[in-house]
Amino acid sequence: MADNLRRLVSNEALRSLQDKLESWLREYNANSCDQNLNHCLELIEQVAKVQGQLFGILTIAAQEGGHYDGVETIKSRLLPWLEASFTAASLGKPVDSKVPSLQDTFDKDRHKESGTRDIQQLDADLSATRNQLNQVQDDMAETEKTLEEPKNRSAISLLAAEEEINQLKKQLKSLQAQEESRHRNSDRRRSEKRGSERRRVELRGSEQRVSDLDRRSANQRNAEAVCDYEKQLRTLKDEIAVLSAEKSVLQGRSARSRSPSPAPCSRSHSRSRSTSPSSAKARTPSPNRAKLSSVARKAALLSRFSDAYSQGRLDAQCLLRRCIDKAETVQRIIYIATVEAFHVAKMAFRHFKIRVRKSLTPSCAGSNDFEDAVSDYIICHLDLYDSQSSVNDVIRAMNVNPKISFPPEVDFCLLSNFIQEICCIAFAMQTLEPPLDIAFGADGEIFNDCKYRRSYDSDFTAPLVFYHVWPALMENDCVIMKGEAVTRRGAFWNSVRSVSRCRSRSLSPICPRTRIGLGMISRSRSPSPIRCGLPRF
């Protein structure tokens, strides 16, 4: 093969072929057709000779490779070229490199075969994985069954063990009871023997103890009697001092003015004056009340006020509903009673504080803690407040109030307990620092969500208050407890006409000469629509 290749290299056929092509190109236009054909055939013959030599070299090279070497190269290089050459020769077209060759088809077929093999391999792997998954699931089910069996066995054994333990406990208890009964019997016998011996010894010592106790009891009785006599003597002296102070005060007032005053006309101060102290030592302060701090008293009063709203108000409504069918009238009556009770209690507190100041002045004059002493005395002696007189004043004020429309057979004395509780709460609230008071409320005012909450039967879109159900509790300008109000649209103007025609069951507040009229006129506070003769819009 090397010799043939050497001959081909040494042969100058390829070099002369290039020279012939160049000369033919120069003479192509000048030559005739036959001359051009002859030149072309000569070139083809020369190329055919070169191809023959190359095919010989190819054959020898393939033989040197054996049976299998070089097969892929021939398939990939020679066969596609031959296919394209023969196809182009048969069609009379030049060889085009873009025409798909056998190599491309072979490559495509090979890729298709490899793709199908891969798909088959993947299908086989997937089926194997599924088989493994099914096997694992079966194994899990079997393991669950195998685990449940020992669980059930252990549960059964546990129940059996518990039953055995319970039986053993019962047996142990029975044995312990038997042992205890035996010990008790033996202890009883021993205790009886010891008791008989102790009784003998105690009988001997009891005689001596009885004699000693008789002596001690006689001495204690004598000492207690002496203490009682001393206490009675002190109380008598204090009462004498109180009476003498009251007498001097009354004499001084009668000497100053003979005309009757509005304050003594009411019974709200008669009882408290009769029991007014002349000095801070007239009545010993209650230890339970003295220990209460301002915060504790405030919390207790707030709780009482809340109970009065939640329970006392409902009880009063039940009492009034027996005589009055209209719920609006009942709620108005209770609200007015609460407002009047606060007003009367505040007035009573002012008078009570003035009297305490006068009674404490001789002993505490010039003291820096005089006001503190007055406040402490009032806190410790809240039981001196004449609440029943305040109740009577509240009922009288309600009888002349033109806001309340009611049948003549209803008596406001039904609300005495409720009014008394409100008066006591309001009186005690004045002892706080700062004092608590109810908020001013007027029918037809703009509803304030911070002070009041609407009742269940209200119109929640109405901006004005139709009437109040319960007042709000205030500390200075801060709301401590919200009140309750009813809001309705268009109902306030109708209520104004009905209120102007309502009846009064007692004397008119316009009469200036009556006792009730003087008491009402003497009140000094901001005008309220509840007390005005005409409704306020």
Curated annotation (Swiss-Prot):
A molecular function GO annotation: cardiolipin binding
An example Gene Ontology CC term for this record: cytosol
Comp. bias intervals (Low complexity): 253-287
Residues forming coiled coils: 115-253
Modified residues (Phosphoserine): 85, 127, 154, 157, 286, 508
Keywords noted in UniProt: Coiled coil, Cytoplasm, Lipid-binding, Membrane, Mitochondrion, Mitochondrion outer membrane, Phosphoprotein
Protein localization: Cytoplasm, Cytosol; Mitochondrion outer membrane; Mitochondrion matrix
Gene Ontology biological-process entries: mitochondrial protein catabolic process; mitophagy by internal vacuole formation
Stretch list, region Disordered: 171-221, 249-293
Bias (Basic and acidic residues): 179-217
PANTHER family on file: MITOCHONDRIA-EATING PROTEIN, MITOCHONDRIA-EATING PROTEIN-RELATED
Record function comment: Key regulator of mitochondrial quality that mediates the repairing or degradation of unhealthy mitochondria in response to mitochondrial damage. Mediator of mitochondrial protein catabolic process (also named MALM) by mediating the degradation of damaged proteins inside mitochondria by promoting the accumulation in the mitochondrial matrix of hydrolases that are characteristic of the lysosomal lumen.
Quaternary state and interactors: Interacts (via coiled-coil domains) with BNIP3L (via BH3 domain). Interacts (via coiled-coil domains) with BNIP3 (via BH3 domain). Interacts with YWHAG/14-3-3 protein gamma; a protein that also plays a role in MALM.
Family classification: Belongs to the MIEAP family.
Protein name in the entry: Mitochondria-eating protein
Organism lineage string: Eukaryota, Metazoa, Chordata, Craniata, Vertebrata
Gene name as annotated: SPATA18
